[in-house]
Amino acid sequence: PWQFERDDQAVAEWSVDNQGPDGQPRLRVVVTRQGRVAWNPQFSYAGLKLVGGEPYTLQFLARSDEPREFGINAMMAHDPWEQFGFNATVKTDRQWQSHRYTFIPNKGDANARISFTGLKPGAYELAAVSLRPGGIVGLEPGQSLEAESVAIVRRSAVNLTKAARQDWIDFLYSTEQDYWLGMYRFIKDELKVRPIVSGTQLSYSPMHIQASLDYIDAHSYWHHPAFPGRPWDSRDWYVQNAALVNTPGGTLSGLAVRRVAGMAYTVSEYNHPAPIQYAAEGFPMIAAFGAFQGWDGIFSFAYSHNTDFEPGKISSFFDIKGDTSRMVHMPACAAMFLRGDVAPAREALSVAVTPEAERATLYKTLSAWEITADNYGLDPRLSLLHAVAMAKEGRPADLPAAPAKDAVQFVSDTKQIYWDVSQKDAGYFIANTPRSKLFTGFIRGRTFKLGDIALRFGKTRLDWATVSLVAVDGEGFDKPGRLLVAATGQVENQGMTIEDLGSGRITVRDKWGDAPMLCEGIEAELLLPVAAERVALYPLDEAGNRREAAPVAAHNGKARIVLAPRHKTVWYEIQVRE
């Protein structure tokens, strides 16, 4: 049946009559306002059974009130809504025109749909729509190898034969391989460059090509800004205001399955973009997780895009220079990852991705993004328990059982990392080591155990917080030395008005607000495993200098540390004496 999709922003109407060519039924759609995402509104016909590898021909007549274009595709009519390799752009004008597309689905499905999508404001009409098995695919009229008239293959081409797809991939692969290895030899052999060299981030290029260089690199963003209209439009964008702690693995597992066993691995771009209200979780979580996985480098993208290094406010999606909540936990990130407080996994798992298996994936998908361990049999959630990677050679591995689909608690094989989603939409993440500890997540009235330290909260604005603790120069939290505590919640600029777009989407458009930045003071209590008389608590100023000491109380033989908004700070020094 035909379906017409509109979200709460789209304004569009549709009707069916007999005013098509020669009195045929005509579908007319008038769009007044586009939806919140680029593909909305759209209409589709679902319930189709498609057989993978078999040709189908889609035909229809179309016209519009002005020269316009829209997209068509074949995809699942159900979760996970995957497309089948057919995706084309239809151009229309005021005259009825016939359109014919022959395509071969890359997989079969019993409930597929043909979608007409991305309708911008205007009037569109369709008639004589049909989808039939069969059709001729291959060279277009007038094309031949002898005449050298075969056009460059476009990714959006829908009439590629299997041989054409494979020839095209083989050509791209050899061209790219020659480029990367040629540049590598030039840099190393002719220029005599001594540092290690990589090509580009994995997934921009096949794994085996990039693994021929010195190390593997990858990028990832938790809910990168989306631009429904014009790319990078400063007034038309949104981010999903979601917390990673509610999605076990998330971007972290997505990075883990791109690692190559036996090679150095860096993540040279990572961030949880502003104005996501939970962005403080990002760098501490990847620091702990990356150390557990045994990664070699993690880079924030970015500290600054310009020379205004101390703006005193959040200035953009990615620049962390003015964001207290993302900066104040960096000492803990350094301790967990660089100092090595978080221990590497005890067990490393890998799946073999041979050159032949990689090439088969490229033939099928035309995408290097599909060359990840999870597409070769490794459940990405295993990365929450053990180190994971792709092996360049080898036989299929015997992998341990994956966590149950309904699993809600994940404990690393070192027992130092704990991820809990036992309460709906109230996940939390803990890293617990002898010299550093991290909590980030939703509170819900719970008390959290960080080893022999108990952490409980008062009321916070989001019922969420991030707290990091670092033994700066002592051997642990019950030993003499200085401890650094950072506690953050909601942050925003003055005059920053967050606009709720629905479905978890938020924006501030181009109204980022002004300095100084406003930070929530977290109300929390820590119970340290030392006598209160051995402990001094100092709220710190913005430069990290001690302010007047705050009282420390005794509670059942332990030191009771109280963090409170009255201290007007997000970090504290704790001195543990002999």
Task: List the predicted regions and their residue ranges.
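Long, low-hydrophobicity ectodomains and other hydrophilic envelope-associated domains
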Residues: 334-335, 340-539, 556
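Conserved, mostly hydrophobic/aromatic
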Residues: 60, 187, 216, 290, ...
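Substrate-binding cleft of secreted/luminal carbohydrate-active enzymes
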Residues: 220, 275-313
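Exposed aromatic-hydrophobic patches
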Residues: 59, 98-104, 525-528, 559-564
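Glycoside hydrolase catalytic-domain groove-lining segments
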Residues: 146-153, 160, 167, 174, ...
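Short, solvent-exposed loop/turn and secondary-structure capping segments
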Residues: 71-73, 128, 139-142, 209-210, ...
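C-terminal beta-strand-rich structural cap/linker in extracellular carbohydrate-active enzymes
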Residues: 557-578
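Extracellular and organelle-lumenal recognition/adhesion modules and their flexible linkers in secreted
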Residues: 1-154
